Amino acid sequence: MAQRSGKITLYEGKHFTGQKLEVFGDCDNFQDRGFMNRVNSIHVESGAWVCFNHPDFRGQQFILEHGDYPDFFRWNSHSDHMGSCRPVGMHGEHFRLEIFEGCNFTGQCLEFLEDSPFLQSRGWVKNCVNTIKVYGDGAAWSPRSFGAEDFQLSSSLQSDQGPEEATTKPATTQPPFLTANL
């Protein structure tokens, strides 16, 4: 089972001003806690978090790590709306991701054990991925720069199997926890 903990503080105003909401675990609806859905700055005290622009963990996702985010335009130029968040489950230090060119784990396969800013630098010639196999937890970004459009890849969100079990799911344009193509 994944360990999910941490602390994130959301602020209504830029540069950590205005009403604030401190969150220590899953928060499926900010309005239920008396906080409007406008978030202009964030302080991640501990853990990594996935934040969603709609309640109930839906919509565009933002992966935020430890640190300060004083102005939403620096991490989300689309909108200051945010409706829910949850800590990213951690299975320790072990993570592995395999991407496949074809459906059902066929075709060219590329394995990742660490951060990689460009698929092409690792020999991936296609502009899409059809199948992803995840061992542990991770995050991916599209297009080519870290932090552009991001989505979470997590076995802990798919099953309660141990970290050694892989979650396998075909990549489509909008599966539950993947919001963009690679």
UniProtKB/Swiss-Prot annotation:
Coiled-coil segments = none
Tissue distribution is: Not specifically expressed in eye.
Which UniProt keywords are listed? Repeat
Q: Known Gene3D superfamilies for this protein?
A: Crystallins
Report the record's Gene Ontology biological process terms: lens development in camera-type eye; visual perception
**Residue ranges of every copy of the Beta/gamma crystallin 'Greek key' domain listed in the record:** 6-46, 47-89, 95-136
The signal peptide annotation in the UniProt record is none
Any Pfam family from its record, for instance, is Crystall
Question: According to the UniProt entry, which residue ranges have a biased composition of type Polar residues?
Answer: 169-182
* MF term (GO), any: structural constituent of eye lens
Query: Region entry Disordered: which residue ranges?
Result: 153-182
Please describe the quaternary structure of this protein.
Monomer.
**What's this protein's family per the entry?**
Belongs to the beta/gamma-crystallin family.
The protein in question is named Gamma-crystallin N
